[in-house]
């Protein structure tokens, strides 16, 4: 479920409550579908990890070769073995001094894993980095703002990137917690509670969505913004209409960036040519699912859609889970798997979107995206139950592993060898570090302005061309309709009633009249001649030539 900032949410809620006498239930969740399961699912193991209770949170798990790492809202961070779910270690962050006067540690962003370390963020404004081997706290930093999004380590694990609720994006030295740089966009007046999880590309770039509807591409070295992809536009008369957050995580597959926004649809952007491939009308605030051939989108109304990567066509859309607070999807074998607010998990066939299996994993509900690791499905419930499943059908299990391996390869090769800097934008980007002179900063700013202007001009030209084509088409249809109407009016009397004459009849009559005229004129000439030579003839004889008698 989407949540807005509390103060604004309350302001928005008041008029809704006052005006609800009409019993409008358009946004009420539909009942869970009733289906006949086509296969069985085995529970491998289950463990309690603390959970998030009644609070909205997308806290999810992280994996390494041997363990799965979890965190709860209260501050319980633990490592469990992948094979049996046995506890390796656990740490309670609520025991830290800074949380003594708080209700709990209020962990809300995590879990991130990299370089033998794990990281989580809290609504209390703290970032914690722990040793993945034993859970010992390596360092912590207070950043004076809530951390909702999951932090991200660089590929080598030497940097940690954190997005806070104010829109600030901070890079830390992952070894000692020292701050390397800070950048960011000013937050919008009204925005979603959820935030985009940063996406790391090697040790050079990091991508993050913003509340202004953009995906920023930054250099890990100094935080400079070297490219910016417009996904949603913050337009409208009211703050509510202007919500355009990119709160889903950016996704890179090959050379293509995929991103969705709350109100602006989905964008496919070619990172090798810096051109927009396609804009599609799939609005979402949840992360995307994918495999080698497909992109999966969960809309905020509960619709789950499958898009063909090859041509961006829609393969299917399942609308049977309307407003059930459906999670982000994940591909597991031949299925797209999602959860909902009542704790059901659904297996949607990747070919046609039909639900082939459903089960209530936990009655407390599911808000975090399910995860797949080593051919097994990991489902985290709101009460902290971590349930792990596998297929009974070995063929399906093999398919699940195959898809997982393929996805790992896609993720590992994301943007490999690409330069993500927009043409004309170099290391300085838009936001330069403090060591850069004002003159150099202005030069870089001018370069980015020119690049953006060129891009906007190209988009505007394309838009004008499309509008002109639409106007020409409309004019053509208007003229065609007028012609057809005129033609129908001209032809409406053919053979229907006497006295209605066609164009052919008129032409024949005209020809006949012309012939008669010539005949009359000829006779008149003869009559005149005859009259001249026979003036003395009888009047009755002359009159007889005119057809009177």
Please provide the spans of the model-predicted regions.
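C-terminal motif of bacterial Sec signal peptides marking the signal peptidase cleavage site
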Residues: 18-19
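Extracytoplasmic beta-rich repeat domains
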Residues: 24-30, 35-62, 87-112, 139-156, ...
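Structural signature of WD-repeat beta-propellers
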Residues: 72, 122-123, 164-165, 210-211, ...
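Short loop/turn segments that connect beta-strands within beta-propeller blades
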Residues: 81-84, 131-134, 173-176, 220-223, ...
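Loop/turn-rich, solvent-exposed surfaces of beta-rich toroidal or solenoidal domains
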Residues: 298-306, 313-347
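Long, low-complexity, compositionally biased polyampholytic IDRs enriched for Lys/Glu and Gln/Arg
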Residues: 438-492
């Amino acid at each position: 479920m989407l949540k807005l900032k509390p103060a604004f949410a309350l302001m928005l809620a008041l008029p809704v409550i006052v005006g609800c006498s009409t019993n409008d239930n358009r946004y009420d969740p539909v009942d869970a579908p009733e289906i006949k399961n086509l296969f069985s699912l085995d529970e491998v193991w289950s463990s309690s990890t603390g959970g998030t209770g009644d609070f909205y949170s997308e806290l999810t798990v992280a994996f390494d070769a041997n363990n799965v790492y979890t965190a709860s809202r209260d501050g319980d961070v633990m490592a469990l073995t992948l094979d049996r779910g046995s506890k390796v270690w656990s740490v309670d962050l609520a025991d830290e001094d800074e949380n003594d006067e708080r209700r709990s540690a209020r962990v809300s962003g995590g879990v991130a894993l990299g370089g033998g370390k794990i990281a989580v963020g809290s609504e209390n404004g703290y970032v914690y980095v722990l040793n993945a081997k034993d859970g010992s706290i390596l360092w912590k930093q207070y950043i004076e703002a809530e951390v909702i999004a999951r932090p991200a380590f660089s590929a080598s694990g030497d940097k940690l990137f954190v997005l806070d609720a104010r829109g600030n994006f901070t890079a830390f030295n992952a070894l000692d917690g020292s701050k390397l740089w800070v950048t960011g966009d000013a937050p919008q007046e009204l925005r979603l509670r959820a935030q985009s999880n940063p996406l790391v590309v090697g040790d050079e770039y990091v991508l993050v969505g913003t509340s202004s509807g953009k995906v920023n591409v930054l250099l890990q070295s100094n935080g400079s913004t070297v490219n910016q992809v417009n996904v949603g536009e913050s337009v409208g008369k009211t703050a509510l209409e202007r919500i355009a957050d990119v709160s889903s995580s950016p996704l890179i597959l090959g050379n293509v960036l995929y991103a969705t926004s709350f109100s602006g649809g989905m964008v496919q952007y070619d990172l090798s040519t810096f051109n927009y491939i396609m804009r599609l009308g799939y609005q979402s605030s949840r992360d995307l699912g994918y495999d080698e051939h497909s992109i999966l989108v969960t809309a905020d109304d509960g619709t789950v859609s499958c898009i063909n990567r090859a041509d961006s066509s829609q393969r299917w859309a399942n609308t049977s889970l309307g407003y059930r607070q459906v999670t982000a999807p994940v591909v597991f074998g031949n299925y797209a798997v999602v959860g909902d607010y009542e704790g059901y998990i659904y297996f949607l066939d990747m070919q046609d979107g039909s639900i082939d299996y459903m089960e209530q994993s936990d009655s407390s509900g599911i808000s975090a995206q399910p995860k797949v690791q080593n051919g097994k499905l990991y489902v985290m419930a709101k009460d902290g139950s971590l349930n792990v499943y596998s297929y009974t059908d070995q063929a399906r299990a093999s398919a699940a592993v195959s898809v997982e391996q393929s996805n790992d390869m896609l993720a590992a090769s994301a943007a490999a060898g690409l330069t993500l800097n927009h043409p004309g934008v170099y290391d300085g980007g838009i936001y330069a570090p403090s060591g850069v002179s004002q003159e150099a900063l202005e030069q870089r700013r001018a370069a980015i302005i020119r690049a953006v202007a060129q891009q906007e001009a190209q988009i505007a030209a394309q838009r004008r061309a499309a509008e002109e084509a639409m106007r020409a088409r409309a004019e053509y249809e208007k003229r065609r309709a007028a012609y057809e109407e005129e033609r129908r009016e001209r032809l409406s009397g053919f053979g229907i009633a006497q006295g209605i004459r066609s164009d052919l009849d008129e032409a024949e009559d005209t020809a006949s009249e012309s012939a008669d005229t010539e005949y009359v004129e000829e006779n008149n000439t003869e009559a005149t001649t005859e009259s001249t030579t026979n003036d003395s003839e009888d009047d009755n004889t002359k009159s007889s030539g005119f057809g009177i008698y």
